[in-house]
Amino acid sequence: MILCCGESLIDMIPEQTVKDKNGFVPYPGGAIFNTAIGIGRLKCRVGLMSGISTDIFGQQLMAELSASNVDTSNAILSDRPTTLAFVQLTDGQASYLFYDENSAGRMITVEDMPHRLDDVTAFLFGGISLHCCLLYTSDAADEE
């Protein structure tokens, strides 16, 4: 199995509402989340290790993973909020405003990491996840 390690979040995409008001529509996202979804849809064995909230947005993330054949057994569930990324589109270019302080994805600890990864044949790390995963790898090496 390929284990994707990184962020899962909700992209808040600007769209006009039915009454021509500006609003934001929530879409599951995050670079590593999207990669896991794509791999799962190709019917390859893939899992996601990410901090995911149990709030309504986290439920949306988990539903998308399940519908796309992504193993969620290494998801780190938390009652902390889901990271939100508000997207601003200017001339087709996206910029982001993140709300992620104390979120499920940012508050992962070494103790949250899985201890058995026998079925993992490859890892894919996102940049945001490397800090926590490096701590995990360092601790695992110390145990050997």
Question: Which residue ranges define each predicted feature?
Answer:
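Short amphipathic alpha-helices and their capping/turn segments at secondary-structure boundaries
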Residues: 1, 112-115, 138
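Glycine/threonine-rich flexible loop motifs
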Residues: 130-135
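Single conserved hydrophobic/aromatic residue that forms the stacking wall/gate
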Residues: 136-144
